[in-house]
Amino acid sequence: MQAHNLVYFSSVSENTHRFVQKLGVPAMRIPLHSRIEVSDPYVLVLPTYGGGRTAPDLQAGGYVPKQVIAFLNNEYNRALICGVVAAGNTNFGAEFCYAGDVVARKCGVPYLYRFELMGTEDDVTAVRAGLANLWKEH
């Protein structure tokens, strides 16, 4: 694998994929049905699933896509994560971008940014700046 700054998962909605494309940085996509292994430090970008329940239950689980869980269950992949960026929908209320909270906490890495759906140009600018700062430190 070449050096990649981002690893991301995007469902068939392609919202996260479109956001990552706007960033214009090297990225590797976690596939829907197969496994990948990374060899370089990366920031994970992922959507949040399961939001908007009748009563928010932040302990219920189901926020992190199964493909991301499988990816992070690989100890090599987990060891190289440097930060998390999450997508979500503000309609989810307290669960907005909650997958980022889950992954950052479980992996002990910073939660760098959260954005709605495909993100705005301001989101793209902020994430680019955050990535540049992070990679200076690594």
UniProtKB/Swiss-Prot annotation:
Upper classification of the organism: Bacteria, Bacillati, Actinomycetota, Actinomycetes, Mycobacteriales
SUPFAM superfamilies reported for this sequence: Flavoproteins
Name of the coding gene: nrdI
Role summary: Probably involved in ribonucleotide reductase function.
Gene Ontology biological process terms in this record: protein modification process
Organism: Mycobacterium leprae (strain TN)
InterPro entries, sorted: Flavoprotein-like_sf, RNR_Ib_NrdI_bac, RNR_NrdI
Protein name (database record): Protein NrdI
Molecular function terms, GO-annotated: FMN binding
A Pfam entry, by short name: Flavodoxin_NdrI
Family: Belongs to the NrdI family.
